[in-house]
Amino acid sequence: MLEASWEKVQSSLKQNLSKPSYETWIRPTEFSGFKNGELTLIAPNSFSSAWLKNNYSQTIQETAEEIFGEPVTVHVKVKANAESSDEHYSSAPITPPLEASPGSVDSSGSSLRLSKKTLPLLNLRYVFNRFVVGPNSRMAHAAAMAVAESPGREFNPLFICGGVGLGKTHLMQAIGHYRLEIDPGAKVSYVSTETFTNDLILAIRQDRMQAFRDRYRAADLILVDDIQFIEGKEYTQEEFFHTFNALHDAGSQIVLASDRPPSQIPRLQERLMSRFSMGLIADVQAPDLETRMAILQKKAEQERVGLPRDLIQFIAGRFTSNIRELEGALTRAIAFASITGLPMTVDSIAPMLDPNGQGVEVTPKQVLDKVAEVFKVTPDEMRSASRRRPVSQARQVGMYLMRQGTNLSLPRIGDTFGGKDHTTVMYAIEQVEKKLSSDPQIASQVQKIRDLLQIDSRRKR
């Protein structure tokens, strides 16, 4: 009877969670017992146990209380024969090897002289302890850690997808570093799809296909970047299909990175799409404001540079969609201050960070006027304390666009809106960023105002 109640809990969770979330985390979880309000579950391994505790315990608890009809406390244990222990997971080193031996990391095929043009070895900066985890990347980071610790088991392949400059390559190479740190003898191969294709063409021309296959199919861990570029390349897809199968059958871990999920890669063979989707697809999205600030703070610490909080907020508010651009902006700011001798302040750094180098920006009044026009409110209402929905929405959008289109710091933007606190401005920016991906009406209104102000042409995001 109690087990039947757990099945009802699972059924309810299946209705309320996405299919990937349910299939990955809830379905493999086993019922152990329920007594005196204590619900005990068994996770297949330590990673799943930690993930359930951190991300689903409250959801499971609330659902179980509805089914069991009483207060419930959820306990998650690890299956007795699980090969991965919590102790190993938490204490394993994550630092990169100081030097990789020539045979340990293969990133070009140079050992077989297939390519004259080679890719670099794993970037020493791309390790787990230099990756800032936020809501945008938590699942991908956790999956990458799980794969690095226990390759070839649960998530094979691991398919990491997301836009340009969001950390896919960082996570992918961090997996390689981790494996080499705990197993220096591991055969780790990092390759771009372009290099795979070029090596294939060269092998065909030189009649060295067996050498090509031996090299790519010998890896314990293969990391393939930009797999979306395989689209339309029929012979490359054919060869990669057989390479994939050989590696998977041998228990080797496969990690793929793409700017889109498999289902959105055009002219991709159905069988490859199926293979790419058979493990775990983890997406990395643009970081929110707090995560961007944390990224800047961490990079500043690595560079041993002290930054005032308002400058961190300013840069984080100006570069919203690409971590490379965000870190690049900080690098330019540090170099600019070092060369000119100017202090690291918003006033001294802001003009230098104009993406087009033109120093052209909209004025606060222009932003207020255009936002008021589109939202059918007045600038005075936006500066007031009114909490009417149309006014509060317009105010938030105004703060967001003023941050994008002007050089004003958060406190100064707050002053423009009637003396609002800088934390109110931060919250407004955060809310608009969320709504841009979930509320088509807000997205349309924001784009209309951008067009009216020509913010896009003046300031690329």
UniProtKB/Swiss-Prot annotation:
<dbReference type="Pfam" id="PF11638">
    <property type="entry name" value="DnaA_N"/>
</dbReference>
<dbReference type="InterPro" id="IPR024633">
    <property type="entry name" value="DnaA_N_dom"/>
</dbReference>
<dbReference type="GO" id="GO:0008289">
    <property type="term" value="F:lipid binding"/>
</dbReference>
<dbReference type="GO" id="GO:0006275">
    <property type="term" value="P:regulation of DNA replication"/>
</dbReference>
<dbReference type="InterPro" id="IPR003593">
    <property type="entry name" value="AAA+_ATPase"/>
</dbReference>
<dbReference type="InterPro" id="IPR010921">
    <property type="entry name" value="Trp_repressor/repl_initiator"/>
</dbReference>
<feature type="region of interest" description="Domain II">
    <location>
        <begin position="85"/>
        <end position="120"/>
    </location>
</feature>
<comment type="function">
    <text>Isolated domain IV (residues 363-461) binds both E.coli and B.subtilis oriC.</text>
</comment>
<feature type="binding site">
    <location>
        <position position="167"/>
    </location>
    <ligand>
        <name>ATP</name>
    </ligand>
</feature>
<dbReference type="GO" id="GO:0003688">
    <property type="term" value="F:DNA replication origin binding"/>
</dbReference>
<dbReference type="GO" id="GO:0006270">
    <property type="term" value="P:DNA replication initiation"/>
</dbReference>
<dbReference type="InterPro" id="IPR013317">
    <property type="entry name" value="DnaA_dom"/>
</dbReference>
<comment type="similarity">
    <text>Belongs to the DnaA family.</text>
</comment>
<dbReference type="InterPro" id="IPR001957">
    <property type="entry name" value="Chromosome_initiator_DnaA"/>
</dbReference>
<feature type="binding site">
    <location>
        <position position="165"/>
    </location>
    <ligand>
        <name>ATP</name>
    </ligand>
</feature>
<dbReference type="Pfam" id="PF00308">
    <property type="entry name" value="Bac_DnaA"/>
</dbReference>
<dbReference type="GO" id="GO:0016887">
    <property type="term" value="F:ATP hydrolysis activity"/>
</dbReference>
<dbReference type="InterPro" id="IPR018312">
    <property type="entry name" value="Chromosome_initiator_DnaA_CS"/>
</dbReference>
<dbReference type="Pfam" id="PF08299">
    <property type="entry name" value="Bac_DnaA_C"/>
</dbReference>
<feature type="region of interest" description="Domain IV, binds dsDNA">
    <location>
        <begin position="338"/>
        <end position="461"/>
    </location>
</feature>
<dbReference type="InterPro" id="IPR013159">
    <property type="entry name" value="DnaA_C"/>
</dbReference>
<keyword id="KW-0238">DNA-binding</keyword>
<dbReference type="InterPro" id="IPR027417">
    <property type="entry name" value="P-loop_NTPase"/>
</dbReference>
<dbReference type="GO" id="GO:0005524">
    <property type="term" value="F:ATP binding"/>
</dbReference>
<dbReference type="GO" id="GO:0005737">
    <property type="term" value="C:cytoplasm"/>
</dbReference>
<feature type="binding site">
    <location>
        <position position="168"/>
    </location>
    <ligand>
        <name>ATP</name>
    </ligand>
</feature>
<dbReference type="InterPro" id="IPR020591">
    <property type="entry name" value="Chromosome_initiator_DnaA-like"/>
</dbReference>
<dbReference type="InterPro" id="IPR038454">
    <property type="entry name" value="DnaA_N_sf"/>
</dbReference>
<dbReference type="GO" id="GO:0005886">
    <property type="term" value="C:plasma membrane"/>
</dbReference>
<keyword id="KW-0963">Cytoplasm</keyword>
<keyword id="KW-0547">Nucleotide-binding</keyword>
<feature type="binding site">
    <location>
        <position position="169"/>
    </location>
    <ligand>
        <name>ATP</name>
    </ligand>
</feature>
<protein>
    <recommendedName>
        <fullName>Chromosomal replication initiator protein DnaA</fullName>
    </recommendedName>
</protein>
<comment type="function">
    <text>Plays an essential role in the initiation and regulation of chromosomal replication. ATP-DnaA binds to the origin of replication (oriC) to initiate formation of the DNA replication initiation complex once per cell cycle. Binds the DnaA box (a 9 base pair repeat at the origin) and separates the double-stranded (ds)DNA. Forms a right-handed helical filament on oriC DNA; dsDNA binds to the exterior of the filament while single-stranded (ss)DNA is stabiized in the filament's interior.</text>
</comment>
<feature type="region of interest" description="Domain I, interacts with DnaA modulators">
    <location>
        <begin position="1"/>
        <end position="85"/>
    </location>
</feature>
<feature type="region of interest" description="Domain III, AAA+ region">
    <location>
        <begin position="121"/>
        <end position="337"/>
    </location>
</feature>
<feature type="region of interest" description="Disordered">
    <location>
        <begin position="85"/>
        <end position="109"/>
    </location>
</feature>
<keyword id="KW-0067">ATP-binding</keyword>
<comment type="subunit">
    <text>Oligomerizes as a right-handed, spiral filament on DNA at oriC.</text>
</comment>
<keyword id="KW-0446">Lipid-binding</keyword>
<keyword id="KW-0235">DNA replication</keyword>
